[in-house]
Amino acid sequence: MDKHKKENLNSNFIKKYPLIFKKYRPIRKIASGVFSEIYGGINILNNEKVAIKIEKRNIKNKYLESECYTLFSLRNIGIPQVLSFGHNKEYDILVMPLLGKSLLDLFISKNSNYEFKDICLIAIQIIERIQWVHSRKFIHRDIKPDNFLIGLNDPHIIYLIDFGLSKKYQSTKSGKHILYSESKKFTGTITYGSVNSLKCREQSRRDDLESIGYMLIYFMKGRLPWQSVKVDNKKESYLRVSQMKKSILPEELCENLPGEFTDYMKYVKNLKFEENPNYGYLRNLFVQLMKKQGFEEGTCFFSWVNINNININNIKRQMKI
């Protein structure tokens, strides 16, 4: 579809639905996926900037409805707040506060070169985010740089988004863990997906953590070895990438990186299917790595945060430092 046609579709939606739930005005499309689109807009009652996520009501799997349920269950720092959820004749609609750039967009804007302290701070926060998600008995299943956004008004906070593919790994009532299976459809993104997910095995907490590892290595090196794999057939692509990920040793994958990255990958790759990860150990790897480089947690901030415009004590309270 050419750019002109896309713009027409964009403007047609906004013309057709100029006001959502009598107070949210969509202004422009900011993202789109296989099943959903996201529009930036405002709450006309208070001028709050919002993100309006829509999904066709006639699809079989209600990803947006599932995402809304998950977000309600996960309410906490670094998780998008649900402002409104409902539907019209055509769409299910989820309204959330508008967030800032993704970690991928920020990385690209910095010429694919984050400062070292930024990567350590990113690691600490995203491990905390996934620990919280797991503590609520959910797994995310699509960890990637695109799904972590900084706050619009609180750029010191990283938000984990897009819970449409998340699922419960443990029953809240019985406490029973989901069963291991080797006959699942692949869920996630090939570049960051775990070896087990690419082999169509049931995912658990270890898989989210493995994906985080690949993401951090990508930020350190600017590229992952399997990103050069190019095949037309998806199944062949899954097979090739999973073989590369399985065969490459952590020491080789993390070559020329601080040993903490190797330690991280060794730990998460050795986790059992139902094992409860030691998040404190993983988080502390990067706290100690920062200290080695002369940075103290709580006294340094992301390079994109203008500390002259923010209240440091308020940040520390928010981050529980």
Regions found by a protein language model. Name each.
Residues Q81-D92:
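Short beta-strand micro-motifs within the conserved protein kinase catalytic domain, predominantly
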Residues N43-E65:
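ATP-binding glycine-rich loop module of kinase domains
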Residues L99-I108:
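Structural motif in protein kinase domains
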Residues E37:
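Conserved N-lobe ATP-binding subsite of Hanks-type protein kinase domains
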Residues H134-L152:
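Catalytic-loop of the protein kinase fold
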